[in-house]
């Protein structure tokens, strides 16, 4: 008599869970307009957390520390003192 011992194995490997594998969505922070670029009133100039760059002439600051232009003009990123930076918008004078 022929005795057959058949064993069946899983054809898919069991997958364990992991504690990794997720990340928060990026916030797209940083400069939105370049130095020397013409900007319009209301344009967002710089998105930031905290005041990495401070508002200068004709630049406002939003509730989330976003810098925006108050008037039409040319954007300038300037150094103030040793370690402070600010963004200013200077209106263009038409002659």
UniProtKB/Swiss-Prot annotation:
Any one annotated GO CC term: cytosolic large ribosomal subunit
The record's Gene Ontology biological-process terms are:
translation
State a single Gene Ontology molecular function: structural constituent of ribosome
Q: Which InterPro entries match?
A: Ribosomal_bL27 (IPR001684), Ribosomal_bL27_CS (IPR018261)
Q: Mark which residues the record calls propeptide.
A: 1-9
Q: Name one Pfam family in it.
A: Ribosomal_L27
PTM statement from Swiss-Prot or TrEMBL: The N-terminus is cleaved by ribosomal processing cysteine protease Prp.
- Does the keyword Transmembrane helix belong to this entry? no
* Source organism superkingdom: Bacteria
Q: Which terms are listed as keywords in the entry? A: Ribonucleoprotein, Ribosomal protein
NCBIfam families, from UniProt? L27 (TIGR00062)
Family statement drawn from the similarity comment of this UniProt entry:
Belongs to the bacterial ribosomal protein bL27 family.
Q: Protein name, please?
A: Large ribosomal subunit protein bL27
């Amino acid at each position: 008599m022929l005795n057959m011992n058949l064993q069946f194995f899983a054809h898919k490997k069991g997958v364990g869970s992991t504690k990794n594998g997720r990340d928060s969505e990026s916030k797209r922070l940083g400069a939105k307009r370049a130095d020397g670029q013409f900007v319009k009133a209301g344009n967002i100039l710089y998105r930031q957390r905290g005041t990495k760059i401070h508002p200068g002439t004709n630049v406002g600051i939003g509730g989330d520390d976003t810098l925006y232009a108050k008037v039409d003009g040319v954007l300038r990123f300037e150094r103030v003192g040793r370690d402070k930076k600010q963004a200013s918008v200077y209106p263009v004078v038409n002659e």
